């Protein structure tokens, strides 16, 4: 699950290498650790917030609050992870540029808007766009600025690069969230959580999945076709078999919650493999003379 946390930094590292720049590996290690801690906060706090509304009673067996029955303790742990992650990000920003911390704080704010009271925008079906923004342009821009060599620090936030580099992989991350709703449609609807799958119904939502996969890969391959990226970036194709399995599973069994409870893990495999393939493909390009 934590591949979604580390992907922006891995992509930034690969892109910098494709540009003939040497990423700051110490910064990369700190950024990765901080990102994992912050996603831990997001996941645990979401368990807490969903427990408050009762939506996790049946459909979310992996909820630590549901498993342990210790809501307050999980909330304390979540807040500790948030504090630790932000402290590490502050150190990363101190060693690069202060705006890195601001970008990460925006990502955290988007994460809170998703499930946190009084907003709970995920209950209005807005979780997916929030996810794309956080793991796409904002996290990717933060990683690019944090990992740049001191002699090559950009004067402004590199939004154009962050969008071209982060949009496709972030859409794959958004697909993971989208697929997590399929097996708990009835429970979500009963508790007022109007996820996109609840709004569309499982059949129509399953028909959307191939388009999300295609859009994610298209956004990753378009810069190659425009000769902005090396052809080795097409290595993201290694995620395609997992995507094909996901599409087939949801097409045939979208109405059977028990059969599709693992669909988000297939989406996660697609996200991890396609993103890692893109990062590696970019990173090895100079070695292959591309």
Kindly label every feature range from the protein language model.
Residues 58-96, 193-229, 265-274:
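Multi-pass membrane catalytic core of lipid/isoprenoid biosynthesis enzymes
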Residues 1-30, 119-127, 131-134, 149:
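Topogenic membrane-insertion module of multi-pass membrane proteins
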């Amino acid at each position: 699950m934590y591949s979604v946390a580390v992907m922006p930094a891995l992509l930034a590292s690969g892109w910098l290498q494709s540009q003939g720049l040497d990423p700051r590996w110490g910064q990369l290690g700190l950024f990765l650790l901080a990102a994992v801690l912050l996603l831990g906060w997001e996941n645990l706090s979401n368990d807490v917030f969903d427990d408050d509304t009762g939506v996790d009673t049946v459909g979310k067996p992996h909820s630590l609050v549901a498993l342990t029955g210790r809501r307050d303790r999980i909330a304390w742990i979540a807040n500790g992870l948030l504090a630790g992650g932000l402290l590490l990000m502050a150190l990363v920003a101190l060693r690069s540029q202060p705006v890195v911390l601001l970008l990460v704080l925006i990502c955290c704010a988007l994460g809170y808007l998703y499930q946190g009271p009084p907003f709970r925008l995920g209950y209005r079906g807005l979780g997916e766009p929030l996810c794309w923004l956080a793991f796409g342009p904002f996290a990717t821009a933060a990683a690019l600025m944090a990992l740049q060599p001191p002699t090559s620090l950009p004067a402004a936030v590199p939004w154009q690069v962050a969008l071209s580099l982060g949009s496709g992989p972030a859409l794959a991350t958004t697909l993971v969230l989208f697929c997590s709703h399929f097996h708990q449609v009835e429970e979500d609807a009963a508790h007022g959580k109007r996820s996109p799958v609840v709004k569309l119904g499982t059949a129509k939502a399953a028909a959307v999945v191939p388009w999300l996969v295609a859009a994610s890969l298209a956004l990753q391959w378009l810069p190659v076709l425009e000769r902005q990226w090396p052809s080795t970036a097409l290595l993201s194709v290694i995620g395609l078999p997992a995507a094909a399995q996901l599409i087939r599973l949801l097409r045939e069994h979208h109405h059977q919650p028990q059969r599709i409870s693992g669909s988000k893990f297939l989406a996660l495999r697609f996200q991890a493999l396609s993103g890692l393939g893109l990062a590696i493909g970019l990173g090895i390009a100079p070695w292959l003379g591309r």
